[in-house]
């Protein structure tokens, strides 16, 4: 009977150590997070607002939605994610077909993020490559 009692204790110890080892392995080697390669959608709707570029709302890092109406699908932004300029776009009484310095007091080129800047007021500064 005493041998059986020792055997039961050893079995419990072995099971406990196995579970502890499995838990330790899962902490040391967590499953890798899948990184989405889906494109950001601009504009997207989140928190009752339209967003025309990556945002850091509720996050430490910029992110974007993968759907027009945010449905929980998102990814962190990269340098390749800024929204694209929309050409042509309406500015004042003109139809602008490329980045322009008109109306920018810092004399830098800019573009609209929508077809009608007059209506939406969404813009970004152009990069040296004008995108």
Curated annotation (Swiss-Prot):
Secretion signal span: 1-22
Subcellular location(s) per record: Secreted
UniProt KW Disulfide bond keyword: yes
InterPro entries documented for this protein: FN_type2_dom, FN_type2_sf, Kringle-like, SP_Capacitation_Regulator
Keyword line: Disulfide bond, Repeat, Secreted, Signal
Gene3D superfamilies referenced in this protein's UniProt entry, alphabetically: Fibronectin, type II, collagen-binding
Gene Ontology CC terms, in alphabetical order: extracellular region
Function: Binds sperm in vitro but has no effect on sperm capacitation. Also binds gelatin and heparin, but not chondroitin sulfate B or phospholipid liposomes.
Protein name as it appears in the record: Binder of sperm protein homolog 2
Gene name per UniProt: Bsph2
């Amino acid at each position: 009977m005493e041998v059986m009692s020792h055997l039961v204790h050893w079995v419990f110890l072995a099971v406990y150590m196995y579970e502890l080892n499995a838990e330790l392995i899962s902490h040391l080697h967590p499953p890798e997070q899948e990184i989405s390669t889906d494109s950001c959608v601009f504009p997207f709707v989140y928190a009752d607002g339209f967003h025309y570029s990556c945002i850091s709302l509720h996050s430490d890092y910029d992110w974007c939605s993968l759907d027009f109406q945010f449905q929980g699908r998102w990814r962190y932004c990269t340098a390749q994610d800024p929204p694209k300029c929309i050409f042509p776009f309406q500015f004042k009484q003109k139809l602008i077909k490329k980045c322009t310095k008109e109306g920018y007091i810092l004399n830098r080129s800019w573009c609209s993020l929508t077809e009608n800047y007059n209506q939406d007021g969404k813009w970004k500064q152009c990069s040296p490559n004008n995108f």
